[in-house]
């Protein structure tokens, strides 16, 4: 897989030709696969139950606030259960194994290393719950190559709120005009642009890498 990644990247492009200095990555659906639907389907719940659990867990405001991690994991799971108490046992099991929604990609580590080799500074800005981070950190092998990271659970801020972008820029003294942010969600990209950061909405590795090369 590594040679395929390098084949897609322009290895002759030099960072000295660019105004871009900093590459900022989201994690879920960018550097790792995040697929809650396939994970939830794997339980084989009846459709009515499956859809209700999707609603009160993965599609809920509680799930989003869990990324902020201002409360304990137990608190967030209890809130989900309160929304559908008839499915308490299954909700708790779904949450107990929720790290299974995250899978490594075959390009992330190579991509980050490639950008570092070109002289870019690489950072992480990601909505990530404390419990999930603790249980999936072994899948985030690219972290050892980055220059810095802001995870929502560590700063109690979440995208697309402006504060989390300001936290990243301030902590690492980044010039937004010399920075580009890659995220799969349009609203998160737009929030970055409002802070003066260039943004690319990630749809695939090939598409994002090509847009990044054009920008950089």
Locations of regions flagged by a protein language model:
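Glycine-centered short loops/turns at secondary-structure junctions
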Residues: 117-119, 196
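Hydrophobic residues in well-ordered beta-strands that form the structural core
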Residues: 33, 124-126, 201
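Generic structural signal for small/hydrophobic residues in well-ordered secondary structure
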Residues: 26-29, 69, 115, 124, ...
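N-terminal helical cap/lid subdomain that shapes the substrate entry/recognition surface
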Residues: 18-110, 117, 129-132
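Surface-exposed alpha-helical segments enriched in charged/polar residues
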Residues: 110-113, 117, 170, 190
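Asp-based, Mg2+/Mn2+-dependent phosphohydrolase catalytic module
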Residues: 6-11, 15-20, 129-130, 134-216
């Amino acid at each position: 897989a590594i040679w395929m990644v390098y084949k897609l990247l322009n290895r002759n492009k030099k960072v000295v030709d660019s105004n871009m200095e900093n590459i900022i990555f989201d994690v879920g659906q960018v550097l790792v696969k995040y697929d809650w639907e396939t994970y939830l389907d794997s339980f084989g719940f009846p459709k009515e139950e499956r859809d209700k659990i999707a609603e009160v867990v993965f599609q809920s405001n509680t799930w989003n606030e869990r990324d902020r991690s201002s409360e304990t994991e137990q608190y967030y799971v209890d809130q989900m259960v309160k929304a559908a108490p008839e499915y308490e046992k299954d909700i708790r099991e779904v949450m107990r194994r929720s790290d299974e929604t995250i899978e490594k990609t075959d390009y992330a580590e190579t991509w980050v290393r490639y950008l570092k080799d070109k002289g870019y500074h690489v950072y992480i800005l990601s909505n990530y719950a404390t419990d999930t981070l603790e249980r999936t950190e072994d899948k985030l092998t690219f972290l050892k190559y980055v220059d810095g990271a802001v995870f929502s659970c560590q700063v109690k801020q979440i995208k697309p709120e402006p504060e989390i972008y300001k936290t990243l820029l301030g902590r690492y003294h980044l010039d937004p005009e010399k920075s580009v942010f890659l995220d799969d969600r349009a609203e998160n990209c737009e929030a970055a642009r409002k802070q003066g950061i260039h943004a690319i909405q990630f749809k695939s590795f090939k598409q994002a890498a090509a847009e990044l090369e054009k920008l950089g």
